[in-house]
Amino acid sequence: MYNNYIKEEAELIFANSLNLSRKDVAVMSNNTTSSIITIGRKYGSAGRQIGQEVAKYFGIKCYDKELLEHAANDSGICKELFEHHDEKPTNSFLYSLVMDTYSFGYSSAGFTDMPMNHKIFLAQFEAIKKLASEGPCVMVGRCADYALADNPNCFSVFVHANLDWRINRIAQKYNKNAKEAKDMINKTDKSRSSYYNYYTNKKWGSADSYNLCLDSSKLGYEKCIEEIENQLKLLK
């Protein structure tokens, strides 16, 4: 992995000298993919950072909170509302109501009369599909794997790690003590789990729900990145 890192840095220096983009470098190096990679993650497992590095390797975009901005722009709903409802559970009726309304579009009376949290999910669902139609990319969280379940190019990944490893990482990152870090982890994981389980017919974090599951505390950050890259190369 270290040799790969040196190689990538050399390629970027060369690219900068020629004013090339990361995508140009990926094509020149044959580091290309046709996949839309979705990353589910336990809080503190480094799933977002892993997704960002995979995107850099293949010269494609990575969408995390950027998904909220796209959904806000497309729907006309203010971004702050998306941030307020981001990966937070509502009630168990949401899935059926949203999916019934999905076929009507934003301009329908059904959409207009929906509660705001329903509108948020529907707009986000639409934004995920739209971005995926534009080409390969990485999407982090927001039930993207479920939104793209019918897309043959979707490759879903879930990143997890043992609790002690995550507590240490979050404590260092946010200058928290162990108890504060553990509380942050439990609260966020509970929210993400409830959100995913409400909106989909799958179980958050279950191996059956994803194409690939990785333990970042056991494999390490770089090995997780490498494993995703290798799996995607096999799909070419």
Predicted features by range, described:
Residues 1-34:
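Extreme N-terminal, non-catalytic leader segments
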Residues 16, 20, 92, 96-97, ...:
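Small-molecule kinase domains that catalyze NTP-dependent phosphoryl transfer to phosphate-bearing small molecules
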Residues 32-40, 135:
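Pre-Walker A (Motif I) flank of P-loop NTPase domains
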Residues 38-55:
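Glycine-rich phosphate-binding P-loop
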Residues 60-73:
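Short beta-strand-centered segment that lines the nucleotide-binding/catalytic pocket of NTP-utilizing
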Residues 72-136:
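ATP-dependent small-molecule kinase phosphotransfer cores
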Residues 131-134, 143-154, 169:
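RNA pseudouridine synthases
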Residues 150-173, 178-186:
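Conserved phosphate-donor/acceptor-positioning beta-strand/loop module used by diverse small-molecule
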